[in-house]
Amino acid sequence: MENFQYSVQLSDQDWAEFSATADECGLLQAGLASGDELLSSDIDQGDSSGSSPPRAPPLPTGQLAAGGRSRRGCEEEDVATQQPVSRSQGEPVLALGTGQQTPSTSARAEAPPSLGPGASPPSQFSSCPGPASSGDQMQRLLQGPAPRPPGEPPGSPKSPGHSTGSQRPPDSPGAPPRSPSRKKRRAVGAKGGGHTGASASAQTGSPLLPAASPETAKLMAKAGQEELGPGPAGAPEPGPRSPVQEDRPGPGLGLSTPVPVTEQGTDQIRTPRRAKLHTVSTTVWEALPDVSRAKSDMAVSTPASEPQPDRDMAVSTPASEPQSDRDMAVSTPASEPQPDTDMAVSTPASEPQPDRDMAVSIPASKPQSDTAVSTPASEPQSSVALSTPISKPQLDTDVAVSTPASKHGLDVALPTAGPVAKLEVASSPPVSEAVPRMTESSGLVSTPVPRADAAGLAWPPTRRAGPDVVEMEAVVSEPSAGAPGCCSGAPALGLTQVPRKKKVRFSVAGPSPNKPGSGQASARPSAPQTATGAHGGPGAWEAVAVGPRPHQPRILKHLPRPPPSAVTRVGPGSSFAVTLPEAYEFFFCDTIEENEEAEAAAAGQDPAGVQWPDMCEFFFPDVGAQRSRRRGSPEPLPRADPVPAPIPGDPVPISIPEVYEHFFFGEDRLEGVLGPAVPLPLQALEPPRSASEGAGPGTPLKPAVVERLHLALRRAGELRGPVPSFAFSQNDMCLVFVAFATWAVRTSDPHTPDAWKTALLANVGTISAIRYFRRQVGQGRRSHSPSPSS
């Protein structure tokens, strides 16, 4: 990991600068380059630019010093440790501006990674702070690593990430060799914590700051005080630095209190950090103007940073100057990461912080920077207001610092985007408290307006929101709303910009939470949002997704509604309305039934006896037969009379099979009849009768029907008297066949493949016919010859 940190984002020029700085600081390059060969982590990191010479001394340190990182003497060592970490992780970035602006971004990304791996992040805001053991690790990094850096390899520090971090940033101006060692540790911790964080450092630069917002805010406050008081090079109290955990958060701002909270861990942070946040809020309130200015600078450095410039942006690039102060300097290369680290340290989310950085970088690293930058402890609110998605995460981080779950949720949420962060913020109890001022956080979903509200209303509500969060948020509110420089302006811009970027996106998801009004109201709504997707970005997204799902059921409900209308048509359709498919089927089934009913009604209106015969008449030309039938027996009319009543009911479907049977029975009865026309009409007449019989009076009508059938058959036989004359004799058949054969041969194409078949059949048939005729002729002659003779 150490090599990875060194190699990450470090160009040859950066390495050269780092070597020079290392020489100046008396830092041993060998120690910094404990891992000369690139590690698989470097390759995995995919940092082509970071393929720095294995032992090249951490350029970030020199860069940090050059970038006006001159902090406080010993305090800057701690800060330098933080800075080196961020720089080591963002060396390429360091080149941008004294290695602070860009390095700060990269350091942020890297610092969260170190947090992710579990390197205990010192409360120094070193980018490599561990996830939860912030206090112990910070102390180790600050105290133990201090002597170690000059001679020990980066791996020697507590966590390789931390040692690397301290090695990398050895360039911090005015920082003793011990400071570089701490930087190596932190840089290593940051890189080891998450090379992914380094890769996403550019994006997560500001986002990381959100993660470290509480402590970053503290550093920012310190940096602001240093800038305002001693200036960028002004060294804040080294004493607080040594307790970096507290001092770093705010040497002059009282941020030191929040820092120990960060060290204490998520749980500790919840209780002490909130109190510390309150202290920070007070200190930050004072130093926040400075921090705000530094943040403003940072905001200049990055668009999103402006909203977040307070902490994250200041930490990130432009703010590196404001951050050049001990806290800010620490923030610059690693200050953001370090604040993130502090944030991470403050909460187990420290590890998630890399994720957060990643997520923040993806959704809105700028907003997150705002979150982190806006205020160390109070900035969380500003951050929230500024970096809606990230800012929430930051506030959540701060608030989440109060609750590790919240921070972890933020981490998850940050990867997803602003919305998740919002949900995360809501999820944590502190978040809910912070949400009031974090209306932005809650309003992350409803970004623009809620944030503005959060910036303004949320801050007083922030204090209302929760004792811990209130304190922190109170600080935030003042830095955001009243903080001079960037605080007053940047928060508004941050709110405006962040809403544009992400809050607007998620405004749909969570406008209602923000709308509730004051920050507290927003916080409470955001908490429900978090509840929906409470512990994690995914959950938040799921909660958001849940809304659309109800809408889909609504759509389904609307779809079923039409079926009820269709059901009303039939009557039992109400049951079909239950489901869309059933309704669909019901429509069609209903239509079919209606058609059948209409047909039945029409059949009932027209006499069945007349209807079927008419149909048969159309098909068969036995009109005379039917007429005779009707004339001979007026029964058809009676038949029609009984038929109409039954037809509307069962007769229609039942009559069809009966009619079919009657057709066949009629043929059997008419076996002797040659003409098919008569039986068909008779049968046609029969079906209505049978139908009528089946309808009800069928039993008594059966005999009558039989009689009628017999009469019809008789009459048909009489009528057929002329029909037998039409019967073809063999002679006629032969003539017809000859005629057909002649026609077939003449009309067929002889060239077709099957022409021979036609010719063969025609010839054979014709020959047979001719032979037949000849026999007939011979017989005729024979018959005629005797008669004349006789």
Curated annotation (Swiss-Prot):
Ranges that cross the membrane: none
Swiss-Prot/TrEMBL GO biological process terms: regulation of DNA-templated transcription; response to muscle activity
Keyword Lyase: no
Main subcellular localisation: cytoplasm
Feature: compositional bias, Low complexity: 40-52, 111-123, 158-169
Start-end of Pro residues biased regions: 146-157, 170-179, 635-648
UniProt keyword Transcription present: yes
Biased composition annotated in UniProt, kind: Polar residues: 80-89, 98-107, 366-391, 515-532
Annotated keywords: Cytoplasm, Nucleus, Transcription, Transcription regulation
InterPro entries: Perm1
Tissues where this protein is expressed: Muscle-specific expression is increased by endurance exercise.
Record's GO cellular component terms: cytoplasm; nucleus
Region Disordered, annotated ranges: 38-391, 425-449, 507-545, 626-648
Localization per record: Cytoplasm; Nucleus
Reported function: Regulates the expression of selective PPARGC1A/B and ESRRA/B/G target genes with roles in glucose and lipid metabolism, energy transfer, contractile function, muscle mitochondrial biogenesis and oxidative capacity. Required for the efficient induction of MT-CO2, MT-CO3, COX4I1, TFB1M, TFB2M, POLRMT and SIRT3 by PPARGC1A. Positively regulates the PPARGC1A/ESRRG-induced expression of CKMT2, TNNI3 and SLC2A4 and negatively regulates the PPARGC1A/ESRRG-induced expression of PDK4.
Name the UniProt record assigns to this protein: PGC-1 and ERR-induced regulator in muscle protein 1
Organism of derivation: Homo sapiens (Human)
